[in-house]
């Protein structure tokens, strides 16, 4: 199907989030104001006489020799324009600036006028284009357009005609190849003519004679000579501008023609035209008719052409470049994918054309051209390439987009026209928050601005704020005083400023209307070329007055002062509120901090006990089972304690966030401006509203088509079109990916069966055969995890369902949900005027869809989520909302507790009296006797008040009482909350105050009631000391419904929630369940009665507190519960948005980093390829050294090949990494710390795999480096031996090849120990030279005598230019391209030795060229070998270091991924393990996995140890061999110094610089080798330590597994091991580390037994004093304290205190082992052995250890609470 592949890409053509920041708007306004000023000033300065129709000609022109002001005015004017940055006019501006200082130049400019007119044309053009841009930007009153910058419709239309009409001729012929070619040829002629004109004008420009004219010597003759030069300078600029435009046109049109001719459908048609043009023309009588063709038909091409034409017309609008396949039926019956013609031989064959008459020929050609034109219409032509000016190009794109909207079937234009435009100030009564620029957002995220700054808080004196403002109370008080002082000072000025402002505003408004009229008249007359001097002067006057008044109004301080006072008041209110709630927050932080310390202390004690037992068990051969049980219980408790610690850490983080001093942008009752993210959401809603009808229309047409044409099958539609719509897929690849991710993450419970299929595969399968862009889209692991689990098991066949209609319907469902969701988010959070917002009200169907899929802010499109400014707006809105919630929650909590305590606590009553809330009590009068009836009435009234605080037991006994018919609104709200709990809570509700506001809030927010209900449930069931929470639980029948009924309803769906909180102990209780009511109560009870701040707070709430009644208190409690839930909701959003922003920031950083890696690797690859080419060059080498250089060259070739392969691998890896980050999307709905950790692990594994592929070649390169060092070392040895021969005989010229072979062999043998294993040195032979010479070209002229006539490579990686291994100083490398930049040492290639320092000339003594020919050639060879040695030595060090580092990094990444399973045991705040050895807490499967992976890591360490050891051995051997050679060099120097013959000594001393240099080389290499060997030794020690740690950990894990296996055996035989469990419980109770109830719960869960079974030995019957209890025995403590141990059944007492197995137990002996009071019975067991059954009788009916002991007391003597706890634990 042609459309399906493009469907999901086309969907999001309009769904893109565009950020227009306030900076963009301000910059545009500033630029336009400058352009407006230049336009008016320029008309006055340059064009007055040209534009104004009745302008009087000046009596005399401006004379630059007498008028010195004009030149300065021009300079200032041009400088202002240059500052605007319009680069296309740079040459013209520079010309005017160059001519203005010269009086001749000024005179020319005045006379010519062309330069000024050109500049003014550009200014007016930019002014109009940018005014039009501002007009579009501020459409629908999105922003305000200043009066003097508005543009009329006439001007807009004219601008469109000028820019679009100028390119219209090209658009008219863009599909006609014939006309395009003619047009191209004509423009090429124009290009040639312009080039000739430019060359001609350039010749006229003479550099001489450009001096200025400043005296009387200036005359007209000199000016007449200069004028043609000035004119030529302008002409060159003018012609170049035209040339650039025409060349762009030619380039674009040639590309267009080439694209059309290469098209698979057009190509055969074009071939037919060429054949027809070349065919002869005859008369009609002689024409030949082809076989099988009617004589009346013009030809096969003609008939097929007509069919093709209609086919092309039918499919013209289906895609951007789909027409590549259309019309190919002319010669091919079918077309393959991507527009490639079928391989049928008939398709590639152009049939022979019959000879036609001229008329027939022309008609046939015209028909073919018509077909081509129809096909070309469907192939996209990008006209944007012809534009030179970017401002003009931007306008063209904008207008073309508008045209496409107007031409489409959508109602975008109609909707805009019919929409009632509401002014911006009315639409957004509180204004708009514009987004921050992206770079500012990145900086804020990098610096964690929300947590490291004080928000919108500044010191009134503009001094820096202290860093301890949150903790330093005095600093806050000082700041509050300073703010109050500043407010008073500013308010004093405000009245005067207000009067001044009103006066200036009145004056400005008075000038506004006259200016508008004058401006309208001016621009209209100028537009119609009817501008008169009167109109212009009037406009100038009114404009000057208007701009003056506008400037005065803008500079008025009233507005700024008022804003400053509002800001200061906001800061003051916040600081005062913060100071009030600071004590409560501090207490909360202290509570959770203490709880954390307590947990950490318990964890440390448990961890030490666990480790001690673990060590004992590891070291012991015989492990007591009771100790195993104790260990397992402690480990289980340790895990739970760590979980509890992390929960407490989360609660502590929440409390610390409350403690964060952060002044929001809006606070309290201040009007909140519309957040930018809601503006983005509104745009998406508007776009979806336009797009959904189009999809519905497509669905209707598709259904109609399927009904009309049932014969059309999916197979016919599977024939894909030509090259797919690359433009649409490129625009929306990420959006389509995001659509699938978003849609797949929203379950549709009520959809049809087809709707349950995953959304993601649909676009992927559809787009894969047609677009490259979609193939490159990578779906990350985090996105894959959002797919429904049932996707893989779907039974619906894929092919029958994958139809165009199926796709359209799925798309429509997703868009409808997205539309409903975005509308809901907008409705819940927007501050838009109600009338404007009513347009977006949800229909009943939309609300149903939204409710079923539980829409929230997390469902916004990825285009919004992945936009940094928009996402930061979401985050900032949540941060501000949290601060408001914290304050409101404090106020309501305080009022609630004040009301509750006012009658109980005298100090509270005293505070209320001081604040004037209640009247002081009158003096007590004698109490009269109360009649019985009155007392009875009081008793009846008392429950109405006291029922607000019932006992927890009362609550549990009356769960259904509040659910009555008197509370329908609450019940309804509760039912609604079940569908969307807390997802769409409006942020504005957090600011509601008062009971009336809360009622409205709860009515609008279903989640509020459910949230408060759960809070009340927790309050009433978790603690006996929470009267405030329980107070509203059971109200009187006359009160509104409290929080309890929703809690009851919510518990019915999840019975765990209420019961578990009762059953758990305080240690096991989640930290979040701790009720903070006691903090408020304690604070109020301890507050100082003279606390003026708190008294002022009570005064501010005086009326609200007075109005409180029991009913309103219940309502207040509901509001508090709702705010608590809302704060949790906001905190979750805060954490998620923060993670998202950090994710986007890290993604941005990773993309930049990876791009740098790709750039560096690309440079490295280019240099390696260049080096590879160099290695194949031609070199001339001194005879006798061919083998050294040849072997080194061969090793170098392999080295470069390996490096290239590794570089290609790394490039592939980093490109895939970049692709992953750019295409991957992390939806908010699935974003979490865990998902980011999984992503991080995925990336580490990918890096691990990439590095693993490099290892083998890195190892090979190290070995190749050893080879090269060995060969170069041999060459140096041979050089030294040759110099020794020269010292003996200065006439020595070297040995011939046969005689030289043994010496070469000896040189190789000297350093063969440096070769890697498996590499041997082949003995050089005479044939070596012969072979080289055979393949070599003839020795070129000028070759040095004695050189080997062969091409012997000698270049190395990093060879320095000039370092030529030749046979003489004049010998050069032939055909080499040596890389002269060797500083890039990325991964494989090491940098060479720095050659910046000047090199000492060691051959300076040998001045006679003819006498020392061989010496100088040998010296050059030595220089080359020396450079090779230094470079090879540096390279092998770098390769070895990089190889070891890569493996270490790979191993570390592997271990980090491995340790991910231990994250549960990390402290959230420090990211460190809570205990030292977290491995012991893993289960067996994970331990096995850890062992396998640790063994793999150990294997890697062994390889590193082997590599390092081999490296140490190599460098030590290198030092040893070089020391021997160094000693020989020193000896030779000493021999020369000791020479007695003066003549010989002077001759030999010439060689001392060479020998000293060789000595220095050896000393340098030896020193560096020893240093690196020591470094490798340190690495080796570290590797051994690391290996030892891994081995110890592996052994410990194996021991842990053995212990766990024994424990598993114990669990399997739990029924027989109850006594062991009892012993373990007893020991644990004695230790004090584990509570009695806690240990039994853990043991019950571990043994999978009923908790009561573990009470076989009650704690009071557990032995305390008896220590030496043998194995297979049980100990019992009587009620009187007597302790006794007895052997268990099946065992008997042996020698000493032991119990041995009893193979034949009988009741006759020792009562069979039963208690003496018990009855004993013999029974046959399944193993044909006897078994004893003991039965305890009254008065001791309770059996212990299967009747070995009998007692009168049983488990029923235990605490009833413990029994209930165990029962509940086993049930749930």
From Swiss-Prot:
Comp. bias intervals (Low complexity):
305-319, 724-796, 930-946, 956-1052
Q: Which Pfam families match?
A: EGF_MSP1_1, MSP1_C
Start and end residues of each stretch annotated as Disordered:
290-319, 703-796, 924-1070, 1362-1383
Going by the UniProt record, its keywords in alphabetical order are:
Cell membrane, Disulfide bond, EGF-like domain, Glycoprotein, GPI-anchor, Lipoprotein, Malaria, Membrane, Merozoite, Repeat, Secreted, Signal
The protein's topology relative to the membrane is: Lipid-anchor; GPI-anchor
Which N-terminal stretch is annotated as signal sequence? 1-18
- Which residues form the lipid moiety-binding region (GPI-anchor amidated serine)? 1751
User: Any chance you could tell me the propeptide residue ranges?
Assistant: 1752-1772
Question: Which superkingdom, per the lineage?
Answer: Eukaryota
Disulfide bond positions: 1663-1675, 1687-1699, 1707-1720, 1714-1734, 1736-1750
Q: Where is the EGF-like domain?
A: 1661-1703, 1704-1752
InterPro entries found in the cross-reference section = MSP1_C, MSP1_EGF_1
Q: Which GO terms describe its cellular component?
A: extracellular region; plasma membrane; side of membrane
What role is this protein assigned? During the asexual blood stage, involved in merozoite egress from host erythrocytes possibly via its interaction with the host cytoskeleton protein spectrin resulting in the destabilization of the host cytoskeleton and thus leading to erythrocyte cell membrane rupture. Involved in the binding to host erythrocytes and is required for host erythrocyte invasion.
What is said about its interaction partners and assembly? Answer: Forms a complex composed of subunits p83, p30, p38, and p42 which remain non-covalently associated; the complex is formed at the merozoite surface prior to egress from host erythrocytes.
What is the name listed in the Swiss-Prot or TrEMBL entry for this protein? Merozoite surface protein 1
Cite the source lineage. Eukaryota, Sar, Alveolata, Apicomplexa, Aconoidasida
């Amino acid at each position: 199907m042609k459309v399906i592949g493009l469907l999901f890409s086309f969907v999001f053509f309009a769904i893109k989030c565009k950020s227009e920041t306030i900076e963009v708007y301000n910059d545009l306004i500033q630029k336009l104001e400058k352009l407006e000023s230049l336009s008016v000033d320029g008309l006055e300065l340059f064009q007055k006489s040209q534009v104004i129709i009745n302008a009087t000609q000046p009596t005399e022109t401006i004379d630059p020799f007498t008028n010195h002001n004009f030149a300065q005015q021009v300079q200032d004017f041009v400088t202002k324009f240059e500052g605007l940055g319009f680069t296309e006019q740079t040459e013209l501006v520079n010309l005017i600036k160059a001519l203005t200082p010269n009086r001749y130049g000024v005179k020319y400019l005045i006379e010519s006028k062309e330069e000024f007119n050109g500049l003014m044309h550009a200014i007016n053009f930019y002014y109009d284009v940018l005014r039009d841009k501002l007009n579009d930007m501020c459409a629908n009153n999105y922003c305000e357009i200043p009066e003097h910058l508005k543009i009329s419709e006439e001007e807009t239309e004219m601008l469109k005609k000028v820019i679009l009409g100028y390119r219209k001729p090209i658009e008219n012929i863009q599909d006609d190849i014939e006309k395009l070619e003619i047009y191209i040829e004509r423009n090429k002629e124009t290009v040639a003519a312009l080039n000739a004109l430019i060359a001609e004008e350039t010749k006229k420009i003479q550099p001489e004679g450009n001096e200025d004219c400043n005296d009387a010597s200036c005359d007209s003759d000199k000016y007449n000579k200069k004028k043609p030069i000035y004119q030529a300078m302008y002409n060159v600029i003018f012609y170049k501008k035209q040339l650039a435009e025409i060349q762009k046109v030619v380039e674009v049109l040639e590309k267009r023609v080439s694209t059309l001719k290469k098209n698979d459908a057009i190509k055969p048609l074009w071939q037919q035209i060429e054949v027809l043009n070349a065919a002869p023309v005859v008369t009609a009588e002689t024409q030949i008719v082809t076989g099988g063709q009617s004589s009346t038909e013009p030809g096969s091409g003609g008939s097929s052409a007509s069919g093709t034409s209609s086919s092309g017309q039918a499919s013209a609008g289906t895609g951007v470049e789909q027409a590549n396949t259309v019309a190919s039926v002319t010669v091919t019956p079918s077309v393959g994918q991507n527009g490639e013609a079928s391989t049928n031989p008939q398709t590639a064959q152009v049939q022979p054309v019959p000879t036609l008459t001229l008329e027939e020929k022309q008609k046939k050609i015209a028909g073919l051209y018509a077909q081509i034109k129809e096909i070309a219409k469907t192939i996209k032509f990008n006209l944007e390439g012809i534009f030179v000016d970017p401002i003009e190009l931007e306008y063209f794109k904008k207008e073309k987009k508008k045209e496409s909207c107007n031409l489409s079937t959508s109602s975008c234009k109609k909707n805009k026209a019919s929409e009632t435009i509401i002014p911006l100030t009315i639409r957004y009564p509180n204004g708009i928050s514009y987004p921050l620029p992206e770079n500012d957002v990145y900086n804020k995220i990098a610096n964690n601005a929300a947590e490291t700054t004080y928000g919108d808080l500044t010191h009134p004196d503009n001094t820096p704020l202290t860093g301890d403002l949150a903790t330093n109370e005095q600093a806050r008080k000082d700041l509050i005083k300073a703010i109050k002082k500043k407010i008073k000072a500013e308010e004093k000025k405000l009245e005067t400023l207000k009067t001044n402002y009103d006066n200036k505003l009145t004056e400005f408004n008075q000038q506004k209307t006259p200016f508008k009229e004058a401006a309208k008249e001016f621009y209209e007359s100028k537009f119609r070329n009817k501008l008169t001097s009167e109109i212009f002067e009037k406009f100038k006057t009114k404009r000057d007055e208007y701009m003056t008044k506008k400037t005065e109004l803008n500079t008025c301080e009233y507005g700024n002062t008022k804003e400053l006072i509002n800001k200061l008041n906001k800061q003051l209110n916040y600081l005062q509120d913060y100071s009030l709630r600071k004590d409560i927050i501090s207490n909360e932080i202290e509570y959770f901090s203490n709880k954390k310390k307590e947990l950490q202390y318990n964890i440390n004690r448990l961890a030490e006990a666990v480790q001690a037992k673990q060590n004992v068990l590891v070291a012991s051969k015989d492990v007591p089972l009771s100790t195993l049980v104790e260990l397992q219980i402690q480990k289980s408790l340790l895990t739970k304690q760590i979980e509890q610690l992390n929960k407490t850490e989360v609660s502590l983080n929440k409390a610390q966030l409350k403690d964060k001093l952060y002044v929001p942008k809006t606070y309290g009752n201040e009007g909140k401006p519309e957040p930018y993210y809601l503006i983005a959401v509104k745009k998406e809603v508007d776009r979806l509203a336009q797009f959904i009808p189009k999809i519905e229309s497509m669905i209707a047409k598709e259904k109609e088509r399927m009904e009309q044409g049932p014969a059309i099958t999916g197979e016919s539609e599977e024939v894909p079109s030509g090259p797919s719509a690359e433009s649409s897929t490129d625009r929306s690849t990420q959006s389509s990916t995001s659509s699938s991710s978003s849609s797949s993450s929203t379950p549709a419970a009520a959809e049809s069966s087809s709707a349950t299929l995953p959304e993601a595969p649909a676009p992927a399968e559809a787009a894969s055969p047609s677009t490259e862009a979609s193939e490159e889209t990578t779906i990350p692991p985090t996105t894959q995890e959002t797919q429904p689990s049932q996707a893989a098991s779907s039974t619906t066949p894929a092919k029958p369902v994958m139809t165009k209609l199926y796709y359209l319907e799925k798309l429509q469902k997703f868009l409808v949900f997205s539309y409903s969701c975005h509308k809901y988010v907008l409705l819940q959070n927007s501050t838009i005027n109600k009338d404007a917002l009513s347009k977006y009200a949800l229909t009943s169907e939309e609300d149903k869809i939204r409710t079923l899929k539980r829409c929230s802010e997390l469902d916004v499109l990825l285009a919004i989520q992945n936009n940094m400014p928009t996402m930061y707006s979401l985050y900032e809105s949540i941060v501000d909302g949290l601060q408001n919630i914290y304050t409101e929650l404090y106020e309501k909590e305080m009022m609630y507790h004040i009301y509750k305590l006012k009658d109980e606590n005298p100090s509270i009553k005293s505070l209320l009296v001081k604040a004037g809330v209640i009247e002081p009590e009158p003096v007590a009068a004698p109490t009269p006797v109360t009649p019985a009836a009155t007392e009875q009435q009081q008793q009846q009234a008392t429950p109405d008040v006291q029922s607000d605080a019932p006992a927890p037991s009362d609550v549990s006994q009356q769960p259904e009482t509040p659910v009555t018919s008197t509370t329908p609104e609450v019940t309804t709200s509760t039912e609604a909350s079940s569908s969307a709990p807390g997802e769409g809570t409006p942020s504005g509700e957090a600011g509601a105050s008062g009971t009336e506001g809360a009622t409205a809030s709860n009515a609008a927010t279903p989640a509020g009631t459910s949230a408060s209900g759960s809070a009340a449930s927790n309050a009433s069931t978790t603690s006996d000391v929470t009267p405030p929470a329980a107070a509203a639980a059971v109200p009187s029948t006359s009160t509104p419904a409290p929080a309890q009924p929703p809690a009851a309803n919510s518990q019915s769906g999840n019975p765990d929630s209420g019961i578990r909180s009762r059953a758990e102990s305080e240690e096991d209780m989640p930290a979040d369940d701790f009720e903070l009511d006691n903090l408020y109560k304690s604070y109020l009870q301890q507050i100082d009665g003279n606390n003026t701040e708190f008294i002022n707070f009570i005064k501010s709430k005086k009326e609200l507190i007075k109005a409180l009644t029991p009913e309103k208190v219940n309502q207040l409690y509901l509001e508090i519960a709702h705010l608590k839930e809302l704060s949790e909701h906001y905190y979750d959003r805060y954490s998620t948005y923060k993670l998202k922003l950090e994710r986007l920031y890290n993604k941005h950083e990773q993309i930049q980093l990876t791009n740098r890696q790709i750039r560096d690797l690309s440079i490295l690859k280019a240099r390696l390829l260049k080096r590879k080419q160099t290695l194949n060059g031609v070199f001339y080498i001194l005879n006798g050294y061919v083998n050294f250089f040849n072997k080194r060259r061969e090793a170098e070739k392999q080295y470069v090949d390996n490096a290239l392969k590794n570089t290609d691998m790394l490039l592939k890896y980093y490109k895939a990494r970049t692709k992953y980050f750019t295409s991957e999307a992390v939806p908010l709905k699935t974003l979490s710390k865990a998902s980011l950790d999984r992503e991080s692990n995925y990336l580490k594994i990918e890096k691990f795999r990439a590095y693993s592929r490099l290892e083998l070649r890195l190892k090979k390169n190290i070995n190749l480096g050893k080879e090269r060092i060995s060969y170069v070392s041999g060459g140096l040895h041979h050089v030294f031996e040759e110099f020794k021969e020269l010292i003996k005989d200065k006439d020595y010229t070297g040995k011939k090849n046969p005689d030289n072979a043994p010496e070469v062999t000896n040189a190789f043998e000297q350093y063969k120990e440096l070769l890697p294993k498996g590499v041997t040195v082949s003995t050089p032979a005479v044939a070596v030279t012969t072979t080289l010479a055979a393949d070599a070209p003839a020795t070129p002229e000028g070759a040095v005598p004695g050189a080997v006539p062969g091409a012997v490579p000698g270049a190395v990686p990093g060879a320095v230019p000039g370092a030529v291994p030749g046979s003489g100083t004049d010998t050069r490398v032939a055909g080499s391209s040596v890389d002269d930049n060797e500083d890039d040492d990325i991964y494989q290639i090491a940098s060479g030795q720095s050659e910046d320092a000047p090199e000492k000339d060691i051959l300076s003594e040998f001045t006679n060229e003819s006498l020392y020919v061989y010496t100088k050639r040998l010296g050059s060879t030595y220089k080359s070998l020396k450079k090779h040695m230094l470079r090879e030595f540096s390279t092998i060090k770098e390769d070895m270091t990089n190889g070891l580092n890569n493996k270490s990094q790979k191993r570390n990444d592997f271990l980090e991924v491995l340790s991910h399973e231990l994250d549960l045991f990390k402290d959230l705040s420090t990211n460190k393990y809570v205990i030292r050895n977290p491995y012991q807490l893993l289960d067996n499967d994970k331990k096995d996995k850890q062992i396998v992976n640790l063994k793999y890591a150990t294997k890697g360490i062994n390889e590193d140890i082997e590599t390092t050891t081999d490296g140490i051995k190599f460098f030590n051997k290198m030092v040893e061999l070089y020391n021997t050679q160094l000693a020989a060099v020193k000896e030779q120097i000493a021999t020369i110094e000791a020479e007695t013959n003066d003549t010989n000594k002077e001759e030999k001393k010439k060689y001392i610089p060479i020998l000293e240099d060789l000595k220095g080389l050896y000393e340098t290499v030896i020193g560096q080798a020893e240093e690196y060997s020591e470094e490798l030794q340190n690495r080796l020690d570290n590797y051994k330590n690391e290996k030892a740690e891994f081995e110890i950990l592996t052994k410990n894990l194996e021991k842990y597994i053995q212990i766990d296996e024994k424990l598993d055996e114990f669990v399997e035989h739990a029924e027989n091991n109850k006594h062991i469990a009892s012993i373990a419980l007893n020991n644990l109770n004695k230790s004090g580390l584990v509570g009695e109830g806690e240990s039994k719960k853990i043991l019950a869960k571990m043994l999978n037994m009923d908790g009561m079974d573990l009470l076989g030995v009650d704690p009071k019957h557990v032995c305390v004093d008896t220590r030496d209890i043998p194995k297979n025995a049980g100990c019992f403590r009587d009620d009187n304290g007597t302790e006794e141990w007895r052997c268990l059944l099946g065992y008997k007492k042996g020698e000493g205190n032991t119990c041995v197995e009893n193979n034949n137990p009988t009741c006759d002996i020792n009562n069979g082992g039963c208690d003496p009071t018990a009855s004993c019975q013999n029974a046959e067991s399944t193993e044909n052995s006897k078994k004893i059954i003991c039965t305890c009788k009254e008065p001791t009916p309770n059996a212990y250890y299967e009747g070995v002991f009998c007692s009168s007391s049983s488990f029923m003597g235990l605490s009833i609470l413990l029994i209930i706890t165990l029962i509940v634990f086993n049930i749930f």
